[in-house]
Amino acid sequence: MAWNVDFYQDDDGKLPVMKWLDTLPEEVRGKVIARIDLLKEGGPTLDYPYTSQIDGRLREIRLRVGKTRYRVLYFFDDDRTAILLHGLTKNTPAVEEADKRIGSARMAKHEARLGSKRSAGARRGKGEGNK
């Protein structure tokens, strides 16, 4: 079964992971996209060394090219969609706390938006039944 993968969108409509991907050399970008495709195929069962848990539901897609490490922070939302939150390039093994905070904040914002959409849909559904 294929899983859905989507890019987190800022309030101003920008896609931060897409912007990060555009900064990568073409060869590396292709490899990162191939890992994203693996996530589409494997969903939450895709594990180390391709992905790993960061904190709670926050996970990372992992890729190393030479000495440089590339990561995409993501999580699975309640709609069973992997939301790509934050892309980073690093030379150290650990993900920096600042990057974790960015990923966590975007995850919380996405979940709040999803909750708002569901609440609005539930309210509309209740109103329609009373007509």
Where in the sequence are the language-model features?
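Basic, Lys/Arg-enriched alpha-helical interface segments
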Residues: 1-69, 78-82, 89-131
